[in-house]
Amino acid sequence: MTDNKKYDVVAIGNAMLDVLCEVSEPFLDQEGISKGVMNLVSRERSNNILKLVKPVKETAGGSAANTISTLAKLGLKTGYIGKIADDQQGGVFKKDLIHDSIIYKTAFLDKGNSESTGKCIVLITPDKERTMNTYLGATEYLSDIDIDEELIAYSEWLYLEGYRFDGQESKKAFYKAIEIAKKNKTKIAITLSDSFCVDRHRSDFINLLNESADLVFCNEDELKSLYEVEYIEAAQKLIADTISCVACTCAEKGAYLFHKSSIRRISTKKVSVIDTTGAGDNFASGFLYGLSKNFSLEKCAALGNEIAGEVLTVYGPRIEKSLTNFIKVNA
């Protein structure tokens, strides 16, 4: 970290609990659920889905919060901004952040609001693909007054979760955070989050990335959706003209690193996959950890692949085991 910065990464995202459930392929068809993406659902729909499945695990989640959690376990100084209700689920979420020594000061949802803390029902099919059904709840009410200027100003990186574009108030909050970051020379990383999310907000995303992003995280489907191309290589010139660096994950193929006019594939080791939830979030953790150590972009991507590989072998979006050995090897 530079002398005037107190934090390595501060993130803004959807604060919610993840409920992981194993289901069959026919279940998704019967319930009309689009596979492999994030489906926005109402509280009623969320409750109805839960009546039909048997949860395997319940854990604090949210894409950016998952990234921040792993960064904290890697020893980085982190902060998080996201809205929860003052309820049991919100208490679990907040407790997990505090346990990981993450700075979290966002006020609870106003007591006059009946929404509960957000919940994401993650349906895992036999091929280990995850399909998310997200009730946003309290997180939808994140607004510009929740943006902690000091937290962002004193951070090396601001990490923005694309899912938060699903809401006008939180979109305003994003732009306020970006303004603060630019004013204080805080670098900006943005994750595209989901191909359907990109479809909903393509124009806004492209403008945001072109004008503000120092680093973009995405997967293959999200990148193709963003630039409306059939192959990710076709996006190279569009990226080179506007964005300094894009790290694009491609499942077992590893990751593609777009930097200026070059494109490189960084391979990954094969692992026994149990659940793909949180793989992209943890890739971002490894990459940002590498940047904090001033590693090359290629090594950052390799570390991203390694950390993503760790979470693929467990249920849920977060690594629970100690990362001490990883830190020793990559100090």
Residue spans of the language-model regions?
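Alpha-helix C-terminal capping segments
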Residues: 68-77, 123-125, 290-293
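Conserved phosphate-binding/catalytic loop of the ribokinase/pfkB sugar-kinase fold
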Residues: 105-111, 122-168
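A short, aliphatic-rich alpha-helical micro-motif
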Residues: 4, 151-153, 209-210, 240
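Glycine-rich phosphate/adenosyl-contacting loop at the front of the ribokinase-like
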Residues: 1-81, 91-92
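Conserved beta-alpha-beta core of the PfkB/ribokinase-like small-molecule kinase fold
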Residues: 157-234, 253-255
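A glycine-rich helix N-cap at a beta->alpha junction
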Residues: 96-114
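Conserved phosphate-binding/catalytic region of the ribokinase-like
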Residues: 1-10, 15, 29-35, 52, ...
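Hydrophobic beta-strand scaffold residues
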Residues: 78, 104, 188-189, 246
